[in-house]
């Protein structure tokens, strides 16, 4: 297996995008790219080549950079099966219980509805890294747009476990 190097990129007024690089094959992913430009600037600064776009849900502040990045780098877009028709450029659909091999790093996929119906989270056990989009924030959870409060509560419990 492979550990992740993680770079946080602040975007917009209150978003964060994450660049991840796994140590085995050197694959580089971006989690929830709201905008392409800050991602491209950071990739250039680090000398990394993007291979994957990893989405947690369909909202534009998490997918807005997908198409530009996919066109520029020819990368693979992965995201929730339930949001397939709402995420531009998606290539691989994931759902609860799936594992996703990102180079030599393995992500466990969990459905985490509440903020949106199709929301998923990625847990990289070896790196102890969780990418959960708008399910969980430092000071609370995301707003409930499409799901229910019960779903959000269950999703938070799932992440806690």
Over which residues does each language-model region extend?
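Extreme N-terminal starter segment of soluble prokaryotic enzymes
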Residues: 2-6
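Active-site HxH/HxHxD metal-binding segment of metal-dependent hydrolases
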Residues: 12-13, 25-28, 35-111, 128
